[in-house]
Amino acid sequence: ILEHGGADFVLHLAGYYDFTNEDNEEYQRTNVQGTRNILKLAKQIGTRRFLFASSLAACKFPARGKTIDESSPPVAQYPYAISKRAGEELIKEHQEWFPSAIVRMAAIYSDWCEYPPLYVFINTWTASKWNSRVLGGRGHSAVPYLHVQDLIRFFLKVIEKTDSLPRLCTLNASPNGFTTHIELYKTATRYFFGRDVRSLLMLRFLVVP
């Protein structure tokens, strides 16, 4: 890379995540040690700004009526969130090396639905199975979704505006809001079946032991 003039920007997207909520050595090896390795590489090639892909999931779910913003601390207490917090701390520890941007991303999906939970939801709701109409609780649980093309535009804008950004900044790559599961259910089933399909809301005591 140095032989070809170095690199103005380093975009660190690599990371490990699974849906078990259990600890895994890859969180430390990939998300923490891997970030440390990329930071050292970025210093060697003289980057103008380091862009670190963190996640809104590093922050605790906000209370009703509250939102997550750029000042929200990354204090969620499950393995993936803890590893992202450690990554953010590494960025802060190395800020004297080069300017950096911590980008906390929403749930990223594509036209191919390459976000596993979203795929499972839509695949279930559009199938002819006993549970295809079931939603947990009142369907008010929600996730902020962002299309991968919008994420690309976001990163390009950060690069374009790099000289006007603080040396170290935290940015949320997310819509200004969220999509509830009941909203998602209604949209997906109406589009697929061409009509409204009534959902079945599962009571809390049937879900929580």
Task: Show the residue positions of the predicted features.
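Active-site segment of SDR-like NAD(P)-dependent oxidoreductases
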Residues: 15-17, 56-60, 74, 106-109
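Mid/C-terminal beta-alpha module of Rossmann-like enzyme folds, strongest
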Residues: 154-209
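SDR active-site strand-loop-helix element
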Residues: 10-14, 50-56, 103-105
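NAD(P)H-binding glycine-rich loop region in Rossmannoid oxidoreductase-like domains
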Residues: 1-30, 41, 59
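Catalytic helix-loop patch of NAD(P)-dependent Rossmann-fold dehydrogenases
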Residues: 29, 33, 64-109, 113
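Conserved cofactor-binding/catalytic machinery of classical short-chain dehydrogenase/reductase
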Residues: 9, 34-37, 49, 72, ...
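NAD(P)-dependent short-chain dehydrogenase/reductase
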Residues: 95-143, 148, 157
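Conserved Rossmann-fold NAD(P)-dependent oxidoreductase catalytic core, especially the SDR/UDP-sugar
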Residues: 36-79
